[in-house]
């Protein structure tokens, strides 16, 4: 009887916890500055996965220091 209550408790807990990824979420890259690819270029880094299991890539922001003044 305890095992039956334990199984029902686990099933009810699993039904109340929301799934980790919702089907209503937007799986596309958010703007024109992002691109879905299988591999990011050297000047890009991965943001998230797209709907077709490719990677959403974004350009890296590289700040170049100006000339150092003594």
UniProtKB/Swiss-Prot annotation:
Organism encoding this protein: Homo sapiens
Family affiliation: Belongs to the beta-defensin family.
Gene encoding the protein: DEFB131B
One GO CC annotation: extracellular space
Keywords from the named record: Antibiotic, Antimicrobial, Defensin, Disulfide bond, Secreted, Signal
Any single Pfam family the record assigns to this protein: Defensin_beta_2
Entry annotated with the keyword Signal: yes
S-S bridge residues: 29-56, 36-50, 40-57
Phylogenetic lineage: Eukaryota, Metazoa, Chordata, Craniata, Vertebrata
Residues of the signal peptide: 1-22
GO biological process, any: innate immune response
Record localization: Secreted
Annotated function: Has antibacterial activity.
Keyword DNA-binding: no
PANTHER family: BETA-DEFENSIN 131A, BETA-DEFENSIN 131B
Domain of life where this protein originates: Eukaryota
Protein name: Beta-defensin 131B
């Amino acid at each position: 009887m305890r095992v039956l209550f334990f199984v029902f408790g686990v099933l009810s807990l699993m039904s109340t916890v929301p799934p980790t990824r919702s089907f209503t979420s937007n799986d596309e890259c958010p703007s024109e500055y992002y691109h879905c690819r299988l591999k990011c270029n050297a000047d890009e880094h991965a943001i998230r996965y797209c709907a077709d299991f490719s990677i959403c890539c974004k350009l890296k922001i590289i700040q170049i220091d100006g000339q150092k003044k003594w």
